[in-house]
């Protein structure tokens, strides 16, 4: 338990940040899942549109520090490769 005034404040800030990050992480996963669902359905047009929406969000979360920039790059590359595979 926080004993000092500053420790109590840090605990409150930490909890607030945790909730904010959880919300952002959930949003990110939702957009990525939409792309994956379109890929599994075999719908190239919908998958491409969903990817176009998800891509800047993945980049933004990497910039904000929610995910590592390499993870963002890897995620985008894998999704794009799967979209190209269903087009062929």
Curated annotation (Swiss-Prot):
One of its GO terms (cellular component) is cytosol. Signal peptide: none annotated. It comes from the Bacteria. Pfam families: Ribosomal_S20p (PF01649). One of its GO terms (molecular function) is structural constituent of ribosome. Disulfide bonds: none annotated. Binds directly to 16S ribosomal RNA. This is Small ribosomal subunit protein bS20. The gene is rpsT.
């Amino acid at each position: 338990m926080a004993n000092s005034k500053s420790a109590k404040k840090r605990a409150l800030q930490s909890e607030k940040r945790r909730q904010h990050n959880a919300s952002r992480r959930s949003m990110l996963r939702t957009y990525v899942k939409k792309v994956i669902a379109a890929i599994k359905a075999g719908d190239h047009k919908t998958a491409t549109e969903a990817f176009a929406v998800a891509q800047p969000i993945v980049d933004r979360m990497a910039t904000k520090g929610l995910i590592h920039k390499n993870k963002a790059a890897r995620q985008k590359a894998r999704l794009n490769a799967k979209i190209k595979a269903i087009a062929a």
